Amino acid sequence: MDKIEVRGARTHNLKNINLTIPRDKLIVITGLSGSGKSSLAFDTLYAEGQRRYVESLSAYARQFLSLMEKPDVDHIEGLSPAISIEQKSTSHNPRSTVGTVTEIHDYLRLLFARVGEPRCPNHDVPLAAQTISQMVDKVLSLPEESKMMLLAPVVKERKGEHVKLLEQIAAQGYIRARIDGEICDLSDAPKLELHKKHTIEVVVDRFKVRSDLATRLAESFETALELSGGTAVVASMDEPETEELVFSANFACPHCGYSVPELEPRLFSFNNPAGACPTCDGLGVQQYFDEKRVVQNPSISLASGAVKGWDRRNFYYYQMLTSLAKHYEFDIESPFEALPKKIQQIILNGSGKEEIEFQYMNDRGDVVVRHHAFEGILNNMARRYKETESLSVREELAKNISTCPCHDCGGSRLRQEARHVYIGTTTLPDVAEKSIGETLHFFSELHLSGQRAQIAEKILKEIKERLQFLVNVGLDYLSLSRSAETLSGGEAQRIRLASQIGAGLVGVMYVLDEPSIGLHQRDNERLLNTLLHLRNLGNTVIVVEHDEDAIMAADHIIDIGPGAGVHGGQIVAEGSAKAIMANPHSITGKFLSGVEKIEIPAKRTALDKKKMLKLEGATGNNLKSVNLAIPVGLFTCVTGVSGSGKSTLINDTLFPLAQNALNRAENTQFAPYQSISGLEFFDKVIDIDQSPIGRTPRSNPATYTGLFTPIRELFAGVPESRARGYNPGRFSFNVRGGRCEACQGDGVIKVEMHFLPDVYVPCEQCKGKRYNRETLEIRYKGKTIHQVLEMTVEEAREFFDAIPQIARKLQTLMDVGLSYIRLGQSSTTLSGGEAQRVKLATELSKRDTGKTLYVLDEPTTGLHFADIKQLLTVLHRLRDQGNTIVVIEHNLDVIKTADWIIDLGPEGGNGGGQIIATGTPEQVAEVKGSHTARFLKTLLQKR
């Protein structure tokens, strides 16, 4: 069978579509945001492919797997087992790293366990057990006639007089010993000091090196090893300064006896007690109460609240500090920063063993005197955090916690034994810290010899293949030790894509969601080659994508539309790129052929050099002391290849700093920097990202934008409502009163099914309307509150035309292209792009001061060319009101319309972290050595 037949698909907004998809091809599904692409790809094709596979398993196995809901479709034929690679499922497990997710770490563990060489951490000598024959050969290789002695170390750096031991050695017939470096006669041994450390080595044999000594030496070594427990030393008698030969028959350091168990792969796993650093349990970081967070306001006194919860208002702790101030003679009313450093340390870390007289007043007003040490504010918080069972106390205390790399393993997560196993001069933590590109180069250049080369051959092949796949999807700048929870959606998705190629499956249907997200134009070609490679293996690759290169490279394109939401869900065009461009009804085709396009502004807004937001000396992650200058009142684009430092600079440094200063956010963590100036030009900073607007089915666009409040007030103002005494709360489905209590205002009831997915059935009482009968009797202009929530934004705009407060908010939702969503649509069903535009609309509808700093990270995710055009209109409108827009973006259509560009690079990871170009798009396009400039120049020449 060479095709997938879909008949009568009605999932979400799909309008009973029929479709024939060729198998073993690269298929791109495109269309406006919200047109039904994901409904077809994920909720129909993938869901059915996965469901059929899971249903073929036993009932016992099924209970452990989440079964997909059966899509609303008449018939699908020709499906293969399906694998979906989405962006949503980034791992939040702190133990997951790029190495563990891609399984490269498993191969590295095996490699180091089989061909690694353990070394002593103190003396940096290889730990190797030598045979007696090897020891004899080594001695016989010394110059002939050299006078040597063979010693057996019996005491190493141990205190004591050792009288008994010396007597025993003499009784065994030995004549001499070297005690603390001096040769002594055992019949006249010196008296040793009891409290000093001593080293005693017995002289087992003295000889001149000659070739016929082999048998004698073998016997002497045997005796020495038995006497010392496995160690022997050969020293020169003529030249004492010559380096001594130390031999060990144990797998141990001959100098200090340090030994490791047999090397096993689990010794190199930080998720196994055998390999994890015992201090941080293999997490690589430690939590501690940070004095910078605890002393929130050092410019005021302890009494006034320098430390939250320890001021006048908390009488118990305030009494403590008063007694402490009396004992150490400092003023509790002085600013904390003015107190002597020693006093500050006592307040934070405690008085040690020094006891202090504390006076406490009990409930009856009696003064009680107690003598004890002061534990210190930081220790007090740490103790309470450990002991408390109250979630609110724990959450409050957690605000003062910071994390730092583990002081024991330095963030490598492994125990000491694993950190000192080498291949050449490199350890496993060294390999994990390198960028993937460097790691691939290291293993390509690695030459092992003999038996080790044979053992490592297959392991190295697997490692190099997997690293090459990661490089091919544009992730060469990541390191294997990078925590999986710090990856962006696009990065996590491409890692899973690389893992799938590594798996080498054939005959599978892969469904991908915009794999080009977060990828610079430079890396796009490599990504497309990867997708084509998956197809060439014999798989059907279905990609939801808006990227022009991907659409042009596809074997078959499905364009869904014509509009979004209720206006979408139909197949507008399908076939090759040429067929799509020739179709007059396809918006995608119009943009591909150039009939429609996003215009380049005729002139750029000039910048005012006196009004700049400046951030200097930013050094977070890979930033190399970056000095950033953003023009106030302009639309600035921050560009650069993946991993060049854009997110670190904007999201981890600039945004949290501005948030602290402008929004008075408490305890926001930011990356290191030197200085920031220019924040006085703003009154607030807003980050408009693609995170969901609400995590529960109860939140919806009406509640998020603030529309629902005036709508409820309208219903409460209806004469019938007033006669019944209903207030606006009556029309909320979140509180008792007007909502249906059978389903608590959800409209559906969840039925748990153990071997099947949970089923949500409409509530029998309210028939899914969320409100009780009495509330639904109130009508405004003939409509109930439920009917209003079911309206699309477009219908509601017409319905509430006479109410400016509501109409304005609805108009902004239409301006950002969301005319099709329903007011009461659950926020969990909105795509990332839709959620972001709801936030944008909410901002647009507020009374504007023209002094806002907006930060957007890749706002074009999930947006079609037509949606991007609309988004840019909105952003330019915000800019025209005097606001400053900072956008991190790879999309050239956005970059070309910016007033100002800041390009980071030149490469990702360690090869990036510098600003390599700034200026208008025309100026940046001329910069040599910038990857962005190369693509931008081509685009600007098409004007």
Curated annotation (Swiss-Prot):
The keyword DNA repair applies. GO terms for cellular component: cytoplasm; excinuclease repair complex. It comes from the Bacteria. The keyword Nucleotide-binding applies. It is found in: Cytoplasm. Pfam families: UvrA_DNA-bind, UvrA_inter. Keywords: ATP-binding, Cytoplasm, DNA damage, DNA excision, DNA repair, DNA-binding, Excision nuclease, Metal-binding, Nucleotide-binding, Repeat, SOS response, Zinc, Zinc-finger. A zinc finger (C4-type) spans 253-280, 740-766. InterPro entries: ABC_transporter-like_ATP-bd (IPR003439), ABC_transporter-like_CS (IPR017871), ATP_grasp_subdomain_1 (IPR013815), P-loop_NTPase (IPR027417), UvrA (IPR004602), UvrA_DNA-bd (IPR041552), UvrA_inter (IPR041102). One of its GO terms (biological process) is nucleotide-excision repair. ATP binds at residues 31-38, 640-647. Residues 310-587, 607-937 form the ABC transporter domain. The UvrABC repair system catalyzes the recognition and processing of DNA lesions. UvrA is an ATPase and a DNA-binding protein. A damage recognition complex composed of 2 UvrA and 2 UvrB subunits scans DNA for abnormalities. When the presence of a lesion has been verified by UvrB, the UvrA molecules dissociate. Forms a heterotetramer with UvrB during the search for lesions. Belongs to the ABC transporter superfamily. UvrA family. This is UvrABC system protein A. It comes from Pasteurella multocida (strain Pm70). The lineage of its organism: Bacteria, Pseudomonadati, Pseudomonadota, Gammaproteobacteria, Pasteurellales.
